[in-house]
Amino acid sequence: MTSQISKALASVVSRRMMTLVLLVMSLLSLHAQQSQPTMEQQLAALQRLEAMQPDSIQPKYQQAVLLLGTVCSQPQSSKAQQYIDEAQRVIQRIEALQPTKAADRSDLATLHGFYYTAIIVTNPQQNGPRYYRQALDSFDEALKLNPKNALAQMLLERFKEGMVRNLNHSDHPCK
């Protein structure tokens, strides 16, 4: 009789513990989803870092990558042009530092290619013919300066894939 009571009590305790564990896991999961910083929060953090390190290229570079990446992932956003304009200002601040190292000049050329890519994705029909050569030339320059520039390699590959996709799915005269 005592063993039956012990088993029943153990079962109740076990269920309550399992419920408690599931509740804690749900709360942690919810907190993790809510605690992801927004793009604006990430940008503000990078701007604070830039203010602390005004002669450093990296905080500026990361800002431009964040802005242009956001445009490329959400090209129809109402803020796309605002982000492109801000990225252009950030790129100009990098240029003002007159980078001399090949890796820094490669990063700058990568940003130029990414900038033209962002302009193109907001309106491929109009901007593609106008800016595709600048984008390709910028990525090529970046890879000439630093063949190991992983971002330039990836962006060039995606750019070429996007060009092929647009040629195959449009009324392009070269088709």
Language-model features: locations:
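N-terminal secretory signal peptides that target proteins for export/translocation
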Residues: M1-S14
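Bacterial N-terminal signal peptides
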Residues: R16-S29
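Immediate post-signal-peptide N-terminus of mature secreted/exported proteins
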Residues: Q33-Y61
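Short coil/turn connectors between adjacent alpha-helices in alpha-solenoid helical repeat scaffolds
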Residues: Q34-T38, V71-I84, I119-Y132, M163-C174
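Structural marker of alpha-solenoid helical repeat scaffolds
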Residues: M52, L97-K101, L145
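Amphipathic alpha-helical repeat scaffolds of TPR domains
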Residues: Q53-Q74, A102-N123, A150-V164
